[in-house]
Amino acid sequence: MIRTLAISLITLFSPFLYSCQKTPEAVTPAPDKEQQEQVEDAGKTLIVYYSFSGDCRSIVASLTANIDAEVLEIQPAEEGLNYAANNYAIGSSLIAAIREKPNDAASYPAIKPVNRNVADYDTVIIVTPLWWSNMAAPMQSYLFQKGSKMAGKTIGLIVSSYSSGISSVVADAKRLIPEGKFVEESLWINNSNRSGKDGLIKNWLSSF
């Protein structure tokens, strides 16, 4: 009788005992090291700029207020040159040399060594002034050296000028970065819209 009672109790409570068992949790495999690095590097952005008057530096400040990016300033190797003197005579001669022989490394003015490897980034935003309708010579020097390493990367271009149109600067960028994936519209900051640059930059960034 005792045995019969024990069997009955087990039969009665077995559903309850089964329901209280802890169900093993599914374990999601951790990504391997390579996958983890790919996730961490996704969307990494580099802002490259050259600024003589300070206008492009101000544009970069607006950019970094809106996005997480690393910044690289391009600097001429020769310090203290006044590019604005004598109606921008120095800048004009530098641009003329590049126009004459755009495929000759000797046509481009020397710049200081850079400390960023562009291959580490997925997106590159170039901020440059306009000189005599073209891209400023120091920025052209940088892109002549590094443009081939930007193949397949998303490229954004912001050009600062007083009033001149930027079509030749866009052409310079595409010549120097022939395999870049350019954002459809480049951003033109000029004397008439400069006071509203923060809003213009924010709207432009939404196109990425």
Regions found by a protein language model. Name each.
Residues F16-S19:
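C-terminal motif of bacterial Sec signal peptides marking the signal peptidase cleavage site
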Residues F52-D55, P76-G80, L130-N134, S161-G165, ...:
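Solvent-exposed loop/turn segments at secondary-structure junctions
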Residues L12, P29, F182-F208:
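Glycine-rich phosphate/pyrophosphate-binding loop and the adjoining helix
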Residues A6-S14:
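Hydrophobic helical h-region of N-terminal Sec-dependent signal peptides
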Residues M1-L5:
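Positively charged n-region of N-terminal signal peptides that target proteins for export
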Residues Q21-T123, M135, G199-S207:
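N-terminal beta1-alpha1-beta2 submodule of the flavodoxin-like/Rossmannoid cofactor-binding fold
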Residues N66-L72, I177-E184:
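Structural alpha-beta junctions
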Residues A89-P178:
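Helix-loop-strand module that forms the ligand-binding subsite of alpha/beta enzymes
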